[in-house]
């Protein structure tokens, strides 16, 4: 299986800014055929670390591999059997067509829309492999089974020997643009991308399609603070809150302080 990695996520512009974007990964075996196991799950290439994308950015291995620690949020979802793949990346628009603000879109990419599910991911596997140049990488494989309203599209793509299956990770990365390195801070899931399937990985690796600037959105510490405030408001009203509104660990991994600013009162007001 030959991976062509080009990840999606929140890409850092400055120490206090990250940007939501989308990049692609194409995966298939040498014959273009993936065979399911006895339970109907396909061992599907999802991503790779310790490798570069077509823009030359290097996906640092240690931070990527750390996302697969047993106690990570990602692996907890795998253990609970609730890691699902969506058909296409979430777009930063509300149902009425208006553009989401930053904290709305951040919450959206951290959740799964049941109406967009195309597969269930049963297991994640890290294996030692090599890239197209023979350099060592960590390949991410997932045991995926067609499921949900868009499961038929995933199955049609994965069983067609003439058609590539494209997946793209939803992750949060911090970038070092001077050194050309991406550090992974959080993985939400993987999405199937490419409407109806794409013939050949090179079509998506062309320079004209490498950058998705129209989908980028700047995220700052204030964005996480707004998500945190919304979580506190829901708790105070007695509502149950999902993990997507808990940004404490995410803020720590980004090195951001999202605690409210306390203004000292002037002496004459004490």
Curated annotation (Swiss-Prot):
Site keyed Cleavage: positions? 210
Q: Which residues form a coiled coil?
A: none
Looking at the keywords, is Repressor present?
A: no
**PTM per Swiss-Prot/TrEMBL:** The self-cleavage of the C-terminus allows the activation of the protease.
Q: Which residues form the active site?
A: 89, 168, 191
Q: What does this protein do?
A: Serine protease that is responsible for cleaving many of the prohead proteins during a major morphogenetic step in viral capsid maturation. Cleaves the major capsid protein at 7 [A,G,S]-X-E recognition sites.
How is this protein named in the record? Capsid maturation protease
Which organism is the protein's source? Pseudomonas phage phiKZ
């Amino acid at each position: 299986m030959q991976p062509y990695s080009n990840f999606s996520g929140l890409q850092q512009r400055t120490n206090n800014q990250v940007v939501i974007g989308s990049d692609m990964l194409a995966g298939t075996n040498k014959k273009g055929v993936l065979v399911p196991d006895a339970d109907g799950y396909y061992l599907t290439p999802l991503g790779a670390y310790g490798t570069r994308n077509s823009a030359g950015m290097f996906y640092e291995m240690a931070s990527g591999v750390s996302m697969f620690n047993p106690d990570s949020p990602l692996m907890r979802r795998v253990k609970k059997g609730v890691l699902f793949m969506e058909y296409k990346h979430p777009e930063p628009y509300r149902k009425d067509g208006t553009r989401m603000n930053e904290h709305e879109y951040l919450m959206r990419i951290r959740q799964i829309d049941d109406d967009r599910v195309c597969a269930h991911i049963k297991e994640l596997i890290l294996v030692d492999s090599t890239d197209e140049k023979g350099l060592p990488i960590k390949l991410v494989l997932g045991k995926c089974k067609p499921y949900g309203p868009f499961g038929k599209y995933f199955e049609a793509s994965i069983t067609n020997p003439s058609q590539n299956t494209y997946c793209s990770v939803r992750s949060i990365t911090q970038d070092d643009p001077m050194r050309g390195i991406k550090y992974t801070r959080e993985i939400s899931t993987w999405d199937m991308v490419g409407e109806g399937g794409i013939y050949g990985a090179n079509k998506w690796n062309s320079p004209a399609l490498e950058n998705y600037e129209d989908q980028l959105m700047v995220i700052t510490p204030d964005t996480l603070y707004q998500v945190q405030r919304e979580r506190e408001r829901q708790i105070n009203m007695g509502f149950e809150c999902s993990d997507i509104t808990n940004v404490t660990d995410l803020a720590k991994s980004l090195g951001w302080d999202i605690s409210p600013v306390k203004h000292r009162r002037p002496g004459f007001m004490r």
